[in-house]
């Protein structure tokens, strides 16, 4: 039984909607999100290789600082192994964070960089909560120089 596609579509995809759908249905590449900024490539390999042979991991990087920014792409050799990862890894914890996986139409150079104005992920621009696993406050809140909450 194959794993269905989610409703999410990359708005920056270079091509038609039907081409994107076709690539998603054939893809062996996953987008992995909600990762800690401190999760390593080795941890990704260790977790995702439980579902099959991992061909490549591409860590998401801040566009300006070239530091991890909470996402990656995992490419498998087979669709079946990628489907197993979506079935069994999606929604599990890695570095105390519940990660999410989704199909990707295939990694293209340049997509490893965050798309937010500050260089990271867009979702981290507007976050108002303090999240130590994702660099503290969201970028807009951090500009207000708010001290982190006291650790009790």
UniProtKB/Swiss-Prot annotation:
<comment type="subunit">
    <text>Component of the nuclear cap-binding complex (CBC), a heterodimer composed of Cbp80 and Cbp20 that interacts with m7GpppG-capped RNA.</text>
</comment>
<comment type="function">
    <text>Component of the cap-binding complex (CBC), which binds co-transcriptionally to the 5' cap of pre-mRNAs and is involved in various processes such as pre-mRNA splicing and RNA-mediated gene silencing (RNAi). The CBC complex is involved in miRNA-mediated RNA interference and is required for primary microRNAs (miRNAs) processing. Also involved in innate immunity via the short interfering RNAs (siRNAs) processing machinery by restricting the viral RNA production.</text>
</comment>
<keyword id="KW-0943">RNA-mediated gene silencing</keyword>
<keyword id="KW-0694">RNA-binding</keyword>
<comment type="similarity">
    <text>Belongs to the RRM NCBP2 family.</text>
</comment>
<feature type="binding site">
    <location>
        <position position="8"/>
    </location>
    <ligand>
        <name>mRNA</name>
    </ligand>
</feature>
<feature type="binding site">
    <location>
        <begin position="100"/>
        <end position="104"/>
    </location>
    <ligand>
        <name>mRNA</name>
    </ligand>
</feature>
<keyword id="KW-0507">mRNA processing</keyword>
<keyword id="KW-0508">mRNA splicing</keyword>
<dbReference type="Pfam" id="PF00076">
    <property type="entry name" value="RRM_1"/>
</dbReference>
<protein>
    <recommendedName>
        <fullName>Nuclear cap-binding protein subunit 2</fullName>
    </recommendedName>
</protein>
<dbReference type="GO" id="GO:0031047">
    <property type="term" value="P:regulatory ncRNA-mediated gene silencing"/>
</dbReference>
<dbReference type="GO" id="GO:0005634">
    <property type="term" value="C:nucleus"/>
</dbReference>
<feature type="binding site">
    <location>
        <position position="31"/>
    </location>
    <ligand>
        <name>mRNA</name>
    </ligand>
</feature>
<dbReference type="GO" id="GO:0005846">
    <property type="term" value="C:nuclear cap binding complex"/>
</dbReference>
<dbReference type="InterPro" id="IPR035979">
    <property type="entry name" value="RBD_domain_sf"/>
</dbReference>
<dbReference type="InterPro" id="IPR027157">
    <property type="entry name" value="NCBP2"/>
</dbReference>
<feature type="domain" description="RRM">
    <location>
        <begin position="28"/>
        <end position="106"/>
    </location>
</feature>
<dbReference type="InterPro" id="IPR034148">
    <property type="entry name" value="NCBP2_RRM"/>
</dbReference>
<feature type="binding site">
    <location>
        <begin position="111"/>
        <end position="115"/>
    </location>
    <ligand>
        <name>mRNA</name>
    </ligand>
</feature>
<feature type="binding site">
    <location>
        <begin position="121"/>
        <end position="122"/>
    </location>
    <ligand>
        <name>mRNA</name>
    </ligand>
</feature>
<dbReference type="InterPro" id="IPR000504">
    <property type="entry name" value="RRM_dom"/>
</dbReference>
<dbReference type="InterPro" id="IPR012677">
    <property type="entry name" value="Nucleotide-bd_a/b_plait_sf"/>
</dbReference>
<dbReference type="GO" id="GO:0045292">
    <property type="term" value="P:mRNA cis splicing, via spliceosome"/>
</dbReference>
<dbReference type="GO" id="GO:0000398">
    <property type="term" value="P:mRNA splicing, via spliceosome"/>
</dbReference>
<keyword id="KW-0539">Nucleus</keyword>
<dbReference type="GO" id="GO:0000339">
    <property type="term" value="F:RNA cap binding"/>
</dbReference>
């Amino acid at each position: 039984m194959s794993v269905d596609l989610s409703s999410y579509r990359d708005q920056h995809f270079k091509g038609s909607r039907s081409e994107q759908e076709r690539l998603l249905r054939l893809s062996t590449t996953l987008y992995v999100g909600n990762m800690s900024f401190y999760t390593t490539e080795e941890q990704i390999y260790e977790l995702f290789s439980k579902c099959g042979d991992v061909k490549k991991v591409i860590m998401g990087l801040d566009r300006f600082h070239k530091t991890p920014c909470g996402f990656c792409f995992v490419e498998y050799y087979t669709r079946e192994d990628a489907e197993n990862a979506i079935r069994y890894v999606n929604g599990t914890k890695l570095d105390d964070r519940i990660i999410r996986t989704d199909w990707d139409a295939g990694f293209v150079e340049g997509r490893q960089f965050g798309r937010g104005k500050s260089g990271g992920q867009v979702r981290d621009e507007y976050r108002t909560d303090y999240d130590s696993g994702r660099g503290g406050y969201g970028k807009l809140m951090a500009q207000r120089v708010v001290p982190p909450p006291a650790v009790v």
